[in-house]
């Protein structure tokens, strides 16, 4: 207020002093403001029922950023105001043909138009530049501003999303019965066309690296029922329909996330003996949790929708959790033994016969085993027969013949025929039999014990191998279920984002595109 009084005082002194330093512009300012007793607090109308028409346009010089977490759009704009003030008219010929006059905004009436949906409490422009006045009273005011407007974020298809942000301007102290807010017009071939779009100067505009502008319409809105008293409520809204450029998120989020997700399939190929099946799956799960945390830090805390990448991470984390559960089951079956568990016939039929054939698991049949394994089994199975034959042979042969049978044949001696036990004197047969049994009984018992242990060991190993095969079958079955689901789910989720396109027209149901290429006459 002190500056205004100083300006008035300076003008008055210059005018009334009569000094030669007074030029025509100073005289004009004095006539308009002092002599005519200009009151900047009064609307520029001749009658109280008249309405002041304010024309607005917006020039965008830079789309600075869109902070999703704060839901704030920061833009650098030039806000153009235009109106007529009959009190600021003059005859240019009387003032050395002055065609334009520049005045501080503190000296004249200006419409108190503010950004309604601001997000930082700054309603007005950042810099109050001079107003331009023409002899016919046409006043223009083009202040620059950096607006931080509220922009509701739709996170449903993040990072393949598009947003509809707006800058809504309204009069702070006047209603629609006192001033009207309209879009500025442009004259082309003698016709007036309203500027129903945000003006962008290609030479002065700085393109944003993350967002691409699709539509930039402007529209006047009237709300006659906004207030109970019927006072019309109006605003002029400039819309920015922008689409995200997803390259940053594809390179830094999606690609590493997908690659790490498919590392969970390695858990199916690792043998249970390695001890790394469970740790591999858990490492993948922790990596996905980190990606989910990073994503949540870039999005607003909203319960209206789940972002696309969030859906993918939750989907993958569910599958990886299934892999971890599968690893636990497989390890449980792998380390089972006959001493702790019994393998039922039903389990053998399902996991050792039916499922391996369906899953194309290679398991050699007994008929396809190598010859040395068949010979070993044949020798093991016929050990008892050999022992019984040896016992019969020892009953027939005497000890001397057994010891010197080959030597006697080389020296031409004829082997003595030993009578069968059971012929001759019974007492002699019994004595001979007892003598033979006493000498070889311990050897036969030892051999039978060895055979028994071998059979038990073979049966034990076979049972353990069957439990291992059951675990491998479950592992293979889970791999054939989880891996295709992971691949198809990944494709389906990200294909959804590919079909999320901005609308062809700015407003649904309105065929007009609100662009400078297709203006419509007022």
Curated annotation (Swiss-Prot):
- What gene, per UniProt, encodes this protein? chrnd
From the record, give the cysteines joined by S-S bonds. 151-165
Q: Which residues lie on this side of the membrane: Cytoplasmic?
A: 334-476
MF annotations from Gene Ontology: acetylcholine-gated monoatomic cation-selective channel activity; transmembrane signaling receptor activity
Tell where it localizes: Postsynaptic cell membrane; Cell membrane
Q: What is this protein called?
A: Acetylcholine receptor subunit delta
**The reaction(s) this protein catalyses:** K(+)(in) = K(+)(out); Na(+)(in) = Na(+)(out)
User: PANTHER family from the xrefs?
Assistant: NEUROTRANSMITTER GATED ION CHANNEL
